[in-house]
Amino acid sequence: MQVSVETTQGLGRRVTITIAADSIETAVKSELVNVAKKVRIDGFRKGKVPMNIVAQRYGASVRQDVLGDLMSRNFIDAIIKEKINPAGAPTYVPGEYKLGEDFTYSVEFEVYPEVELQGLEAIEVEKPIVEVTDADVDGMLDTLRKQQATWKDKDGAVEAEDRVTIDFTGSVDGEEFEGGKASDFVLAMGQGRMIPGFEDGIKGHKAGEEFTIDVTFPEEYHAENLKGKAAKFAINLKKVEERELPELTAEFIKRFGVEDGSVEGLRAEVRKNMERELKSAIRNRVKSQAIEGLVKANDIDVPAALIDSEIDVLRRQAAQRFGGNEKQALELPRELFEEQAKRRVVVGLLLGEVIRTNELKADEERVKGLIEEMASAYEDPKEVIEFYSKNKELMDNMRNVALEEQAVEAVLAKAKVTEKETTFNELMNQQA
């Protein structure tokens, strides 16, 4: 076997391989012997068919199969010998085959980039320092009460957290526009559903009033014909409602799994959940900064085959989320996923190099801790932990999570990490 390797472009490689004629003939004869042992031909007992008849009847197909097998096996031998690491499936380009002559073919593929990590010491990471305070717990209890609130009619003027029912008609330069009209539209104030100025124009008015408000559509508004345009909305305010918050009774508290129905028990449960969310948020915030710094400091070429593979994964995930099937997934435009796919591949290659250079392996104690932390959010943590322990795929996924965390910690060990005090709400709003 003769082998030559050339670079086509960037990460592209072409391996050209020549297989000696006698190697081909030896393999063909060996395979014909195997075929002769199995075939049945009228007039002959099984395994007793003369080789010349076997060769005459099966020679062409056997030769084709042998060539395919030799191409594959010799390519594998070649890349092992040349220490080449292909990224993605190779493309075989067979040359012309002539009986009794050497056979030359080529294989085209991409290789993984050679990554030399740099700039880790210049990565800047700001670690949030946060404590869950009594005021934070109070705020979360208010949120829980608001989620369970009922609405009652209100005679007074509209305020920030009220709910209104309105008819409205929008116009630009005196002309109504598509999508600018609605009847019995229910709007919860303060949720940012409408364009800037719309809710402010309603505040202070009472049920039964009709009025006009002036607003300006944002420059980034999705409808091209409305971007940056001044508009008027004629409003008929039909109903104003205010929240009626439930009291923290034992019955209400038990809805959240606090069996003794006490306020103290609910506060303890809420605090525990908030601290778990906080731990995760801090970890994600630090991780995202470390990875962003790693990517900016290391500009690497990315094999197109890996991007294509990642696009297929993202397509299928998107189709599953919206109830689609395999065919519908492949019809989704690749442009929707290309940027995200490339970033995921880049991050994977860089973290892979961090893992390799630091000789990292998944810490089983960390894996156990991650599973326990995740399980603590469920009603029966022990059942969840047992379920994970018996599922190899889930355990492997969690080991990958742990290994990624360890890689990020290796980056942080060399990065410039500073601490910044912040509040629970500020951090959570940044995560949103």
UniProtKB/Swiss-Prot annotation:
Pfam families: FKBP_C, Trigger_C, Trigger_N. One of its GO terms (cellular component) is cytoplasm. It comes from the Bacteria. It catalyses: [protein]-peptidylproline (omega=180) = [protein]-peptidylproline (omega=0). Its EC number is 5.2.1.8. GO terms for molecular function: peptidyl-prolyl cis-trans isomerase activity; protein folding chaperone; ribosome binding. It is an enzyme of class 5 (isomerase). It is found in: Cytoplasm. One of its GO terms (biological process) is protein transport. Its main location: cytoplasm. Gene3D superfamilies: 3.10.50.40, Trigger factor ribosome-binding domain (3.30.70.1050), Trigger factor, C-terminal domain (1.10.3120.10). Consists of 3 domains; the N-terminus binds the ribosome, the middle domain has PPIase activity, while the C-terminus has intrinsic chaperone activity on its own. NCBIfam families: tig. Homodimer and monomer. In vivo most of the ribosomes are in complex with monomeric TF. Uncomplexed TF, however, is in a monomer-dimer equilibrium with approximately two thirds of TF existing in a dimeric state. PANTHER family: TRIGGER FACTOR CHAPERONE AND PEPTIDYL-PROLYL CIS/TRANS ISOMERASE, TRIGGER FACTOR-LIKE PROTEIN TIG, CHLOROPLASTIC. Involved in protein export. Acts as a chaperone by maintaining the newly synthesized protein in an open conformation. Functions as a peptidyl-prolyl cis-trans isomerase. Belongs to the FKBP-type PPIase family. Tig subfamily. This is Trigger factor. It comes from Escherichia coli O139:H28 (strain E24377A / ETEC). The gene is tig.
